[in-house]
Amino acid sequence: MNMAIMNFLSDIRNAALANAVIVVFHVYIAFAVEGVSFLVIVLPIGGLIAAAYFVKGKIGAALLALPTLGYLFAVPDIVGALTTGESGGDDHIGWGVYILVPFWLFTILLNIMSIVAEARGTSKYANS
């Protein structure tokens, strides 16, 4: 059972799919709230995540590491949104913060676990 959980957490494809959910959410935010110019940030990140899904290995880990670093810079704001219930001027999100923030933190964990597994060569894709 523990190995099944570790295999799930260290699978780069699972991490890429979780990141894709975040990208799709941000595409919605671009059209609904921020404006289409926000896609200038979102689409390249989506491209990195898609490339990591298909490439795998150490190159895939490096591709996935770039959005993960961006997520880590946002962690203080994420924690602030969880503790205060306000999401930095995005008050229209409201209670959705309590759904989005844990998912985002889980995605960061998935990213880190899969990056380590791919970099070490211990993932299930290491021999393929």
Residue map of PLM features:
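Short, amphipathic, aromatic/basic-enriched membrane-interface segments that mark the entry/exit
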Residues: 6-12, 28-39
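Membrane-embedded alpha-helical transmembrane segments of multi-pass integral membrane proteins
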Residues: 22-25, 43-47, 67-74, 106, ...
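Interfacial non-cytosolic loop connecting adjacent transmembrane helices
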Residues: 34-39, 72-101
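Short, aromatic-rich membrane-interface segments at the entry and exit
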Residues: 33-42, 59-64
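Membrane-embedded alpha-helical segments in integral membrane proteins
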Residues: 17-31
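Alpha-helical membrane-associated segments of multi-pass integral membrane proteins
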Residues: 26, 87-128
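Loop-to-transmembrane helix junctions at the membrane interface
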Residues: 48-79
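Cytosolic juxtamembrane helix and N-cap/initiation of the first transmembrane helix
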Residues: 1-21, 110, 117-120, 124
